[in-house]
């Protein structure tokens, strides 16, 4: 998550700027949505979340319901995921990519767009036969892995 995708870009939680994580993550998506919502309150996302903290799921749900504002946010997220992922695919050429974290719960509304945009960023040879799947353990993967290691050592 800490490869650079923007020179002098958004501040990341690591203290650097322009990191992939600052753009292609649930946190990055929420930050972008909140920024856009300050100037555009005429949308389904704002109506549904006014007065409470925004979650990535809210954005994906509103996009699935046809909210143009949220669909633009999903396109933004998909583009940055595809940019970073395309760079990694070009270097590593894996057979499978497992996407975890908050964006993994988005479903086809995001992943269909990521797959389409990957053609702009990855070599066609690395996309042949590539599988992109959501992590089955979700956000608990780290905790489950740590528990597994603890039990087996």
What are these regions (language model features)?
Residues 4-11, 16-153:
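ATP-binding/phosphotransfer module of carbohydrate and carboxylate kinases, centering on a glycine-rich
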């Amino acid at each position: 998550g800490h490869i650079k995708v923007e020179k002098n870009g958004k501040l990341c939680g690591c203290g650097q700027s322009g990191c992939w994580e600052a753009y292609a993550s649930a946190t990055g998506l929420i930050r972008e949505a909140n920024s856009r919502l300050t100037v555009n309150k005429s949308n389904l996302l704002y109506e549904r979340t006014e007065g409470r903290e925004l979650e990535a799921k809210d954005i994906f749900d509103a996009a699935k319901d046809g909210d143009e504002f949220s669909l633009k946010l999903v396109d933004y997220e998909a583009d940055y995921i595809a940019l970073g992922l395309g760079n990694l695919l070009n270097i590593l050429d894996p057979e499978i990519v497992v996407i975890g974290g908050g964006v993994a719960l988005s479903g086809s509304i995001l992943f269909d767009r990521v797959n389409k945009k990957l053609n702009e960023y990855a070599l066609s040879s690395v996309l042949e036969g590539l599988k992109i799947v959501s992590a089955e353990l979700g956000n608990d993967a780290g905790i489950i892995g740590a528990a597994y290691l603890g039990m087996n050592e």
